[in-house]
Amino acid sequence: MTHTLRVIFAGTPEFAAAALAAIHKAGFPVPLVLTQPDRPAGRGMKLQASAVKRYAVEHGMAVAQPPSLRRAGKYPAEAADAIELLRTTPHDVMVVAAYGLLLPQEVLDIPRAGCINIHASLLPRWRGAAPIHRAIEAGDAETGVTLMQMDVGLDTGAMIEEARIAIAPDDTTATLHDRLAAAGARLIVDALVRLERDGTLPATPQPADGVTYAEKIGKHEAALDWRKPADVLARQVRAFDPFPGGVATLDGAAIKLWAAEPVAAHGTIATAAPGTIVEAAPEGVVVACGSGALRVTQLQKPGGKRLPAREFLAGSPLAAGQRFALPDVD
């Protein structure tokens, strides 16, 4: 089916690429795609295009990569050029998903139907940069995707629609991300169909209660503090997969922990100091925590690959009584 509603799309990572692909496949014309500039990545630190740019180029879409859209920012000339491009590109609405650049009011005012954001949480919970990670880390039972009419605030716009998704006990940020991306893609296509048909999308202001912020994940958060309860650490490991991973330091070596589950305290676990390995078995490495213990089932040594505990121990033996370092507490 071919649609007439013209969509400028702004986004950067895989989460956004899923939405762009759905919009394109649904038959909406996309006269322009905005995405972040290419960035160095990988071991060779070569410049790499974003997932959104890769999709757009593959399908013959025009792409712009301004470093900023703020005239008062660090790149005023580039911002001015990008804003002029938006003004001169005929379109009806802008869809924004994990773009990574601030959109000033001047930009929000350009599309006739405004700017619609696809956000990976049930707003107003987890506004900000890392909503998927923080929902898992906090132990939330569910999360979701919210479509909102953008304003200049940080994810504060009026809500158009949401989809709720349960968080499974074994979900990682990677697995949950993929379900949320698919849900967001479905939501935005349905919303664009309604916008084209009705000319408007009703939206409800976000409630004042229940606001939380999902701050960007920093590498410094990766270190596991074994003084915390085992269930908290298990959630941290799941939340930090694929980035930055949970890190445990043993004899100066940083070992990444990729899969773990809490186990009840009994016997030697109950009396062992936090960070102490109480068992190193093929089924997993059991480490004492502030309360309970963590059975780690997937590990990675520096320069190595993720391995199941059985394979990891075959090449890098661990033994009961060894102790992971405790990170400094700010």
Curated annotation (Swiss-Prot):
The keyword Protein biosynthesis applies. CDD domains: FMT_core_Met-tRNA-FMT_N, Met_tRNA_FMT_C. It comes from the Bacteria. It is an enzyme of class 2 (transferase). SUPFAM superfamilies: FMT C-terminal domain-like, Formyltransferase. GO terms for molecular function: methionyl-tRNA formyltransferase activity. GO terms for cellular component: cytosol. This is Methionyl-tRNA formyltransferase. It comes from Burkholderia orbicola (strain MC0-3). Belongs to the Fmt family. Its EC number is 2.1.2.9. Keywords: Protein biosynthesis, Transferase. Attaches a formyl group to the free amino group of methionyl-tRNA(fMet). The formyl group appears to play a dual role in the initiator identity of N-formylmethionyl-tRNA by promoting its recognition by IF2 and preventing the misappropriation of this tRNA by the elongation apparatus. Pfam families: Formyl_trans_C, Formyl_trans_N. (6S)-5,6,7,8-tetrahydrofolate binds at residues 121-124. It catalyses: L-methionyl-tRNA(fMet) + (6R)-10-formyltetrahydrofolate = N-formyl-L-methionyl-tRNA(fMet) + (6S)-5,6,7,8-tetrahydrofolate + H(+). The keyword Lipid biosynthesis does not apply. PROSITE patterns: GART (PS00373). Gene3D superfamilies: Formyl transferase, C-terminal domain (3.10.25.10), Formyl transferase, N-terminal domain (3.40.50.170).
